[in-house]
Amino acid sequence: MGLSTLEQKLTEIISAPVEALGYELVGIEFIRGRQSTLRIYIDSDDGITVDACADVSHQVSAVLDVEDPITVAYNLEVSSPGLERPMFTAEHYTRYLGEEVTLVLRMAMQNRRKWQGIIKAVDGEMITVTVDGKDEVFALSNIQKANLVPHF
């Protein structure tokens, strides 16, 4: 997924303290608005607890206070990826080959911005998704948002 310059900088700043605590930084989202939000997704092989989120929040807050990359007031949220796991990198798509995903594109393809299908292949920065029996290829940089579709 094509990250903004701010999101790239935040990822660089945040990854070290998250990994130092023994967690994987799955990705981040910075949502601008009346009350902006910095959402950080973390994971580990043992799962994520509320205490883990609190520890990461505390460490990341300290680093962000020093680095100060965000010029507006914001809320910090730390959570596990959950069932509708967000996808941020080519590695995420590779890890979930064969799974169903929902994509929201930055720029429409075939007059559509929202797509849903099965992740078929990953080739560098290109993702192939089978939608209604037809393979569609998406540039990672054109994917605004992507989430796994949970099945129960």
Swiss-Prot record:
GO terms for cellular component: cytosol. Pfam families: DUF150_C, RimP_N. The keyword Glycoprotein does not apply. It is found in: Cytoplasm. Coiled coil: none annotated. Keywords: Cytoplasm, Ribosome biogenesis. GO terms for biological process: ribosomal small subunit assembly; translation. Transmembrane segments: none annotated. Required for maturation of 30S ribosomal subunits. Belongs to the RimP family. PANTHER family: RIBOSOME MATURATION FACTOR RIMP (PTHR33867:SF1). This is Ribosome maturation factor RimP.
